Amino acid sequence: MKGRMKLRLVLDTHTHTIASGHAFSTIIENAREAFRKGLQLICITDHGPEMPGGPHIYYFGNLKVIPEKIEGVEILKGVEANIMDEEGRIDLPERILKKLDIVIASLHDECFEPSEDVERNTKALINAIKNPYVDIIGHPGNPIYPIDIERVLEAAKEYGKFIEINNSSFVTSRRGSEKICPIIAGKAKEMGVRVAVGSDAHICFDVGRFDEAIRLLEDINMPEELVLNTSVDKVKQYLQEKRKRIGGGQNSWN
């Protein structure tokens, strides 16, 4: 009998700083904690500007001043954008999106009214997936937005996007997600859809906290090749893939 798979992650794809308005740590504090936990990269993904208390659009334009490495940890520059409507529109313009390394698109009740309308919610996620700048669909297991899981995963596979396995959905956020996330993860494995694991840290101590997400992926023996965060090479390869997809160069900030 094959042994249980062990996952080790090198990147936290989903972290917030004080710029999000309801998070409590700085980029430096997050990087320090990432180094302490043995991560090689983190992505700063503060909320998009339509989130109450979120950063102004200028914040995202000025991410260029952040060094490539802090405390020995490589810093990727991103956003957790808000999906605003069922057309999948997100709250940053193309001129900003094309500069970012990682764009997570998520449904939040402050920006998209919760509804039992599965078709509406599904359409919003699929249309966000079709956006060439979007990389990851954030916390899709939120029970206040029921979706057609298979259709969303089919779209993610078709467009080469990732479905997030969000650790905070098992711990502090979005009650009820812990029942839906295993269904999504299992179906992703079955369909060969890539996933990205994020802590969704809103305080530095949670950066690199993946215990529940990893437990789920190990329990279902998710193939390592379907998990973005397992090697630096895989992350870099995807970022090159993305630059080709959106027509960007090696250094998108120039």
From Swiss-Prot:
GO MF terms here are: phosphatase activity; zinc ion binding
- Which Gene3D superfamilies does its entry note? Metal-dependent hydrolases (3.20.20.140)
Organism in which the protein naturally occurs:
Caldanaerobacter subterraneus subsp. tengcongensis (strain DSM 15242 / JCM 11007 / NBRC 100824 / MB4) (Thermoanaerobacter tengcongensis)
Q: Provide GO CC annotations from the record.
A: cytosol
The cofactor note from the UniProt entry for this protein is: Binds 3 Zn(2+) ions per subunit.
The EC number(s) attached to this protein equal: 3.1.3.-
Q: Which family does it belong to?
A: Belongs to the PHP family.
- Keyword flag Transmembrane: no
Q: Which residues are noted in the entry as Zn(2+) 3-binding?
A: E80, H108, H139
- InterPro entries from the UniProt entry: Phosphatase_YcdX_put, PHP_dom, PHP_phosphatase, Pol/His_phosphatase_N, Pol/histidinol_Pase-like
Protein name as it appears in the record: Probable phosphatase TTE1963
Q: Which cofactor is recorded for it?
A: Zn(2+)
